[in-house]
Amino acid sequence: MSPLGGKEGGRRRRQRAAGAMADGNADWMGSLPAALRSYPLSNLAIPGSHDSFSYWVDEKSPVGPDQATAIKRLARISLVKKIMKKWSVTQNLTFKEQLEGGIRYFDLRVSSKPGEIGQEIYFIHGLFGIKVWDGLMEINTFLEQHPKEVIFLDFNHFYAMDDSHHFFLINRIRSAFGSKLCCVECVEYVTLQYMWEKKHQVLIFYHYPLYREFSFLWPGNKMPAPWANTTNVHKLLQFLETTLEERSRYGTFHVSQAILTPRVKTIARHLVRGLKNTLVHRNLPMILNWVKAQKPGVMGVNIITSDFVELVDFAATVIALNDLLLEEDDSSSKS
């Protein structure tokens, strides 16, 4: 076996990718030109990750309640869980590594673990991931070290959770971030300058009615994330264009999900290859070219998410789009 074979090789490759991605991006918000600090965050270009927590999933745990009954039955066979892992994992980097690489929006799906005593909540995508609390602590440690960086946590799917689970999770969120949490405000008021003055760093979006009871939980409809649900990259890009044309009328943040979604037959045809080798690798260059052609602003992109954010220069490409806002300012001041 080569020195980079097996688990150890995979870990080294991931660390190299994370290191390369992190160069210059850990403090990118704090380093933006002064002119952009008064722009609404909804008008800036911000890199995000899809199923942000899925860098680790537990093959030994039961299949999650987000899966169909037939899948749960099949998953009693250990090989099935190994195959599920290949299609459930959409990121290689940990929260810390993603943050250091410039990712500021996190797509989060959570669940209780049926049969487990207590109210612990876990991340989930087919298989259970780490405890949500552990992820929040990892994120908070980064924020303590980078006080001018602002993040978006989008809790958009909940499984096997009643109100008591939600109250438990919401209290965990409050315990983790405390005064860093930004209370709900008009979207256009929320700028970097606003966040810095109030010493806020975290916006929580919570797609469940209990958000109304907590001033620091933003309603899910303030963070729409239209989903193309296609394996065809051309259809995806057309969908992204169409939904961008519609965003200005809503006065919200906006997520462009630059991701391809496997169908059942896609998985059946490419069982052991997994998501990365079947859909992501070959289509990322075209998706990245689409990103490079975008412009942030009221009529343009805001948050763009991707699978396997380290495979191409994704975060840096999205962040660089903000320079176009400066060019726009220059041209308007000269006219």
Residue ranges and their predicted role:
Residues 1-101, 114-146, 150, 210-220, ...:
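Long, acidic (Asp/Glu-rich), low-complexity accessory segments flanking structured domains
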Residues 98, 109, 153, 204, ...:
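Conserved, mostly hydrophobic/aromatic
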Residues 102-104, 147-151, 198-202, 249-251, ...:
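Short, well-ordered coil/turn segments that N-cap beta-strands
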Residues 107, 112, 147-161:
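Active-site groove signature of glycoside hydrolases
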Residues 128-135, 173-188:
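Acidic, His- and aromatic-enriched active-site or binding-groove loops in soluble protein domains
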Residues 153, 180-195, 230-237, 257-258, ...:
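A generic structural motif
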Residues 156-158, 164-173, 210:
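Eukaryotic endomembrane system proteins
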Residues 197-278:
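Aromatic-lined glycan-binding groove of carbohydrate-active enzymes
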